[in-house]
Amino acid sequence: MFMSNKDKYDKIFMEVFEIAHNQLNKDLKYQSIEAWDSVGHMTLMAALEEEFDIQLEMDDIIDFGTYYTGIETLKKYSIDI
């Protein structure tokens, strides 16, 4: 089954943080949920790099602090969400 980049992005967030789709919103940010701690953050980064076949720069990893910021960050790597 075809999955859009948005579907893939959402699926990664839901799987890494074990959250429901309705929790993917403007309020979802680093440390706003228990699972998005430093370890969860690096797990998320690794999953995104693997899924989209990219290597995130350190500054992008540090600045990737919200669900929506991540969408903008991936645009730098030609990944349209």
Regions of interest found by a model, annotated:
Residues F2-W36, G40-A46, E50-I81:
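Phosphopantetheine-dependent thiolation modules in NRPS/PKS and related acyl-activating systems
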